[in-house]
């Protein structure tokens, strides 16, 4: 008592005493929260990273970042679309011409506006060098086309002789063999097994040779990224008026396919998330339940000697909040080490090795870290609330005498006298059985926790094997 400070508040004294008394439990609880936050943050980030890679993969396979467009669109159709609240942006694309080699087409020539190219087409390409064509004689080719032409080391501004023709067979202006200036080049991933490719020419070349935008393909970027293609098509059909020859083409968005390919369905995703949270709750609850008996006895003793119940609860809340916050910070550091150090290499090796080189992507998402911390703190609060409910339900004397075998409602029936049963040479079986089922509630919670852990391990293995592109 030499170092005792008589000026300390009662709560401070109780907190110090509780911290010293429960050092082992608090240390174990800190480790559990650290691991839980780190694992949940890492799992969420891994799912997010995998989804982003799948979205990029789907965009590259489609050749564009949008999944919905209208064929033979007009200015009137564009005006109708701009009035819909779910439409983010609209672009134009026109398949105007083609490149031939001995009368065989090997490349489509496309004209797009600025919005269509920058926001809806360029994200599907990689290694983009140069700019979109602006002058009449400029062209932008893919590396596949350049290799077909025998050009291994392309340079922006180089002159290339090409046999070009408009898709309108009645328009012969500006067709035939002619020299183009290479304004840029890119790598595409659409139809990799096919020799066909796509090139971009300037809008000025179309205007000079008497072509017009209409009719053209109207590219639609909408907000319903996680709706199916049929749902989007149905929504557009009910809100716009189509003319003769116009039709809506709506595929499943890249985001929708990313979730479907990884989880199978939204239902399974929700089920898996609930299992993770329930397993986490049981994990923390079991840790608190280890010292439940001694904690209640100590709180009962404190109430008997004059400490109010609300003071005990206040001390408990502060103690758990401190452990939760420090454990969350440590878990964030643990998860950050995995996300910055291991996850990019893991994703690149498992998912992007056989398709396209993984571009620089930001996998650390603060919102996922906040979500993981909130879930863990909430789960810790629920587990602590179970302990506080028992404290409120029992009187101080009942808390002092509390054991795991306590029953709150005494039966009026006279207890039956059980006959002694001899187990012969194996009495340990009898003792193990009696200890195992001494508290059926604890036995049930522990069994459920172990079952959930095994199920999560199996589900994780199935998901990882299912999304591995090498399989």
Q: What function would you assign to each model-found segment?
A:
Residues 259-276, 367:
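N-terminal membrane-entry
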